[in-house]
Curated annotation (Swiss-Prot):
One of its GO terms (molecular function) is ATP binding. This is GMP synthase [glutamine-hydrolyzing]. Its EC number is 6.3.5.2. The gene is guaA. Catalyzes the synthesis of GMP from XMP. GO terms for biological process: GMP biosynthetic process. Pfam families: GATase, GMP_synt_C, NAD_synthase. It comes from the Bacteria. The active site is at residues 82, 169, 171.
Length: 512
């Protein structure tokens, strides 16, 4: 970690990444680490402040996540959020219990200390976001209440020990002045300095890549997605044609994707790119397979084999570059208790054993919005930088059931129309992810005077901040009608279209 930033201890909160992003938006470096990180390792980072995240546990329960009390003995400013406030109270001799009236959602915060530095320029009453079933019932000695709601103690402090805490979540947008409250802690109490910008990141990363790689060769699997594209541009800036990108056309890509990627990089960068057409190979392996997990494994295994074959042809290649980003790293760290690994990400710890390369991950400290900023700084066109996420297995998991060339071609055309219309209506950048799913279901229709018996497709569009929870996009009816008319009239093979209005949870954004 860069020294002099903010350390966020993760107790299993769904908002831990959001806290870090909020701090970084202020121009201050923030890093998320597991709550059980060794205190000496935390102190070695020389943090200006420490934030304790929320979490789903109860501090009084057996085996609940806790902290080494030593952390509170160094006079480093500490801010506890939700579970963090309850833990601070519990460890300092106060009491926490199940609340008779639990608080989930918006609540009115009233300040007890209007002049407190945390509430500088904050009105006496404001709306905050609560999400807790436990509450503080008895204050710890030497702590005082600085804000409350109708049903709970909402903020506390022990200024002598430099410890502060909120029962609510200032990091979420529903907390009206939450960003300013965090800002007051970061700059007013922790005295952090602005030390984080994408311009500085590019400069320092280019220098590090040059020093580490020297005159050796680097290979990178270019997918056309944002992360691998930005990683390629950043490494190319550092070492030029010592980088070779391998683009594998699996036959499961979006319409004209291979052509677009090759054109963008030919026009904007002096870069070695090998485009491998492996469509027939992938579709042959997928023939007859309907189980989604099996499809994922086949596509992943085949991709590695194709990549491996091509990588061996590049003389002097000692580094394998990947577009791993910070959320991949956070989600792949095993945290005891509440945050057991959420998922083993394909970019983290997933190297095949026979690929004897050193790993180069120039984006592993960045969130997705920061990756996009770096991409723009490096000259990647907006339409590439702002592309919606596309899964590694591609259309293989957007075609439910068996994958065939016919189905892939049908889905490609339908998806291209949906995306084209979203762009025309200036809606593309207002939704987080949009795509079409092809179902293994046929239904009767009428085209002209003839009966048809063709596939059903689904439009899926979701809005989200962190992709861990999501709502369906409330697209205008007139827009949906236009998309429906175009797909049903222009795409041979689809005669029925539906719109997915499921939120995550309980559904996921992708169908497989």
């Amino acid at each position: 970690m860069k020294k002099g930033g903010i350390v966020i201890l993760d107790f299993g909160s769904q908002y831990n990444q959001l806290i870090a992003r909020r701090v970084r938006e202020m121009g201050v470096y923030a890093e998320v680490v597991p709550f059980h990180e060794d205190v000496d390792k935390i102190l070695a980072r020389e943090p200006k402040g420490i934030i304790l995240s929320g979490g789903p546990a109860s501090v009084y329960a057996e085996g609940a996540p806790s902290l080494d009390i030593k952390l509170f003995q160094n006079n480093i400013p500490i801010l506890g959020l939700c579970y963090g406030m309850q833990l601070i109270t519990h460890l300092h001799g106060g009491k926490v219990a199940r609340a008779d009236k639990q608080e989930f959602g918006k609540a009115e915060l009233e300040l007890d200390d209007k002049n407190h530095i945390l509430y500088k320029n904050i009105p006496n009453k404001t709306t905050v976001w609560m999400s807790h079933g436990d509450h503080v019932t008895e204050m710890a000695p030497d702590f005082k209440i600085i804000a409350h709601t109708d049903s709970s103690i909402a903020a506390i402090e022990n200024s002598d020990k430099n410890i502060y805490a909120f029962q609510y979540h200032p990091e979420v947008t529903h907390s009206q002045h939450g960003f300013d409250m965090l800002k007051n802690f970061i700059f007013g109490i922790a005295k952090a300095e602005k030390n984080w910008s994408m311009e500085n990141y590019i400069e320092s990363t280019v220098k590090q890549i040059k020093e580490r790689v020297g005159n050796k060769q680097v290979i990178l699997g270019l997918s056309g997605g944002v992360d691998s594209s930005v990683a390629a541009a950043l490494i190319n800036k550092a070492i030029g044609r010592q980088l070779t990108c391998i683009f594998v056309d699996t036959g499961l890509l979006r319409k004209d994707e291979a052509k677009q990627v090759m054109e963008v990089y030919a026009k904007n960068f002096d870069m070695n790119i090998k485009c491998i057409n492996a469509e027939e190979r992938f579709l042959t392996k997928l023939a007859g397979v309907t189980d989604p997990e099996t499809k994922r494994k086949i596509i992943g295994k085949e991709f590695v084999e194709v990549f491996n074959e091509e990588a061996k042809k590049i003389e002097g290649a000692e580094f394998l570059a990947q577009g791993t980003i910070y959320p991949d790293v956070i989600e792949s760290v095993s945290v005891k208790g509440p945050s057991v690994t959420i998922k083993s990400h394909h970019n983290v710890g997933g190297l095949p054993e026979d690929l004897k390369f050193e790993l180069l991950e120039p984006l592993r400290e960045l969130f997705k919005d920061e990756v996009r900023k770096v991409g723009r700084e490096l000259g990647i066109p907006d339409y590439m930088v702002d592309r919606h996420p596309f899964p590694g297995p591609g259309l293989g998991i957007r075609i439910l059931g068996e994958v065939t060339k016919e189905k892939a071609d049908i889905l490609r055309e339908a998806d291209a129309i949906f995306i084209e219309e979203l762009r025309k209506a200036d809606l593309y950048n207002k939704v987080s992810q949009a795509f079409v799913v092809l179902l293994p279901v046929k239904s009767v229709g009428v085209m002209g005077d003839e009966r048809t018996y063709e596939y059903t497709a689904v439009l899926r569009s979701a809005n989200t901040i962190d992709f861990m929870t999501a709502t369906w996009s409330h697209l205008p009816y007139e827009f949906l009608e236009k998309v429906s008319n175009r797909i049903l009239n222009e795409v041979k093979g689809i005669n029925r279209l539906t719109y997915d209005i499921s939120s995550k949870p309980p559904a996921t954004i992708e169908w497989e």
